[in-house]
Amino acid sequence: MKYIGAHVSAAGGLANAAIRAAEIDATAFALFTKNQRQWRAAPLTTQTIDEFKAACEKYHYTSAQILPHDSYLINLGHPVAEALEKSRDAFIDEMQRCEQLGLSLLNFHPGSHLMQISEEDCLARIAESINIALDKTEGVTAVIENTAGQGSNLGFKFEHLAAIIAGVEDKSRVGVCIDTCHAFAAGYDLRTPAECEKTFAEFERIVGFKYLRGMHLNDAKSTFGSRVDRHHSLGEGNIGHDAFRWIMQDARFDGIPLILETINPDIWAEEIAWLKAQQTEKAVA
């Protein structure tokens, strides 16, 4: 079964994220559990936790259908010790918030070397950051997102994801989220079913579907291999509809949150309905 949704706003209270997801007939959703552009957040209150859990129960969202995202400020591979410590503390807080909310996944961007350390050193720091956070939490899986490779961001090659996973001690609590726009911008073609097969065969060989814990379904304003992260509405960008139809018809993407971060929230309900409909369309030739 496919879990399909969008990254919805939690403005006015975390419970509102579940309500907004239900309003667009989503069977999955993503959210920030705190302001994603601030380091600090007030601790979750018992009321906030209870209201969130009640809303999820009311609208039938289990933790398997929810993909929280951490703060954009966090860099788990930071080259400077003090800044790395700050990011690690913030990441632990994000993991603990998920734990309190009964959520089992936390999606994050791996990190950046900022042109100050090698890729290898940065990837090792990211893995160690994950190890530290896993040691201090229970029941939450760290879900590494592939990136477009803008600037000095790592995670744009499947090999980067594999290297991070290799450095994580508890393999049962690490996974990946593949963003289609990021993959395309990083040079993984998805424009035809044949290219999708090729790209995900490479993913299986290097990382493995056993680690796939979520997807971000985004078309791309950015061009192929441009290393530029610019999302677009499904079918409106340079990837086109075929990739998303192909994903919907492949059982390897069952049972994980498939999340839209497309640029027009006004048509999310339409995009979700279209994705759902592709599951029963004639298989892509």
Curated annotation (Swiss-Prot):
Positions contributing to Zn(2+) 3 binding: H182, D229, H231
Binding-site residues, Zn(2+) 2: E145, D179, H216, E261
Coiled-coil blocks: none
Cofactor(s) it depends on: Zn(2+)
Lineage: superkingdom: Bacteria
List of residues binding Zn(2+) 1: H69, H109, E145
GO MF entries: deoxyribonuclease IV (phage-T4-induced) activity; DNA binding; DNA-(apurinic or apyrimidinic site) endonuclease activity; phosphoric diester hydrolase activity; zinc ion binding
Cofactor binding mode and count: Binds 3 Zn(2+) ions.
Keywords: DNA damage, DNA repair, Endonuclease, Hydrolase, Metal-binding, Nuclease, Zinc
CDD domains per record: AP2Ec
Catalytic activity: Endonucleolytic cleavage to 5'-phosphooligonucleotide end-products
UniProt EC number: 3.1.21.2
Function, as annotated: Endonuclease IV plays a role in DNA repair. It cleaves phosphodiester bonds at apurinic or apyrimidinic (AP) sites, generating a 3'-hydroxyl group and a 5'-terminal sugar phosphate.
Matching NCBIfam families: nfo (TIGR00587), PRK01060.1-4 (NF002199)
Protein's UniProt name: Probable endonuclease 4
Source organism of this protein record: Escherichia fergusonii (strain ATCC 35469 / DSM 13698 / CCUG 18766 / IAM 14443 / JCM 21226 / LMG 7866 / NBRC 102419 / NCTC 12128 / CDC 0568-73)
The gene coding this protein: nfo
